[in-house]
């Protein structure tokens, strides 16, 4: 399939020179040499056969999950127990188990960061796979983290029983002790709560309730609480937009509570009304990589960018403007052009703000209001990120003054993401409700184990007009309880979790009967009327951009806010943009890298090593932080992903990466930093060099006008091969006898590159479906990652053959410049998996006939025949073996 973009010129899109990454530039000769070799040269036999770290272990090196404490033993026992009472299968009406036949149950996930309505695939009473609930009225899609969440159920690092002063105890004793610590000076601290049943239990408990999020949207929520009287964020309807301008809002990645990838893909179908996408951002995000136009702006410039766009629109409609600092000359014209396009698009325009700033949000919301945007909906709010930084700051002050003596934390690892709270932990008695003894629960006097969402009754009201339920698909693997039952018990209640959820469904006036609600997983409820008004722009004060080096934090596709910090699938998933797995690292522009003496180099065995730096912010220093030189990164701005640097996550997550929140609290968007290169070298787990395209034409892409007006045969010619008979097609240039497919199906699959955003959800889903093993960082560095599906990312360069002819550039100089990246390169994603070739090269070279061709055109593998020669991998032109 072709990739269609709305703005690139025909010459640029048809003949872009793409390069795999910065490694191609640092050592092109070595990179080209590695491209010709499937295997790295310097992997010794000893390295291949063993691992020193596991030499004394009886556990197989390949059995990574078992070594890290993930086991299905508990699941086997739990599945042998009686079926969950009142669970309703989604598809198979009789609740009976047939060996080998899967049952599907509708459920919902909310962990304080992600919300999704899902279908849970179970076999023999065990959850094994998460599927999207396409019938859901709100966020029925899944991302990589939601897909990976099923593995967390089997994590042996979860709490197995209540803990009191570090020792296991009974629920009765733990609850009694916890209740004794609760006084009128106690506070319940949670992440955002969207469960009506849990809210009722919290109200019954009677404690002061403070909610704070690890990735804060508090200042944005403040704007709409003041405007509508309800705390939440506006919902987005991309189907109604024709032009979206996102400023720091990675809406295809982690921004917002909705998963907008499906809506984006639908809106990007080539046609006269195809959605145009413009992105302004500091670091290259998933949204920026998919944008038609990308403007590089520092995070501290976001407010200025939004202010200039607002002023242009305000002038056009005749309302007052706001005072704003001048824009940099290199982006001024681009921003003005965006404003003109927004005005022309009118109600089809959509402006999104990703900065946790009331000023930025007001500017974006008011611009949408002036344009009468149909895609920006403030009457239907999203409640999944409504924590309050103001309330949390007040709590910290009360702890300092001694006004708060005990804190109950519920499903929030606040001592990890808040350095301020961590410094005050000794001043209060802690009671923690959590799934594991994390950094917060390990410091608690009482720790109460909370069940995984796949073994608990839950409900959720994630947005206006939506009510969802979650049902257990397996009995609890350990001695844990659902959050709503724990809080209700602390409040003196005795109801079971299912009774509490049933009562909540009734009080929410769900539109479906109980059994139908469980079957579907969701129901409509009446949308609460919100106050309508207009934003007051008189108090808007636009901040001046920082002059020094800017430091900001961001989230990665696999890790998110860090809720899955002991889940190996989230670590092993390569970042869609950097193509690195397992670590977090500072992303830095090439210009800044030169200034600070930072470099990333490809090693002779194909691995990547780079410089580390010490980052200092307000006297606090993070030492030996690895740096990745990222094309498209704005000069003068560096970013570091949150969720890493754990010490009490479990065997997988402990000591992986650094904790970015030690330098920057979630409530703060950015700050000025100083950087000094250190002498420590860091080894990256890079997968991009491990899979090359052997110098062949990689991407077919065309601009929209040519796509709509031209004949496809003119720009998408079928490849031919030269022969003594003249050019031959692939079918004509056939050295083998044709396969016999007359008596059966002939399967085919194609991927629409215009729809693929590179999010990586399919990579994790493939690993789940096929039981693909996790191998760990060391093995990834040795190019032994086991993903059956990968999503290659390629950058483009501005130099093309046509440009060279126009400028009179010679051949040698032309090819040299083709290897030089643009400062803001275009990005394309290409999923690659087994192509099930008609005459698969892997089949012809296998010495034991382990790879065979089916009569339905599929490439089959007999694992018990394979002897591990890897001739198939050597002979695979797509490098997916």
Name the predicted role of every residue range.
Residues 244-245, 277, 294, 407, ...:
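Short, well-ordered beta-strand core segments
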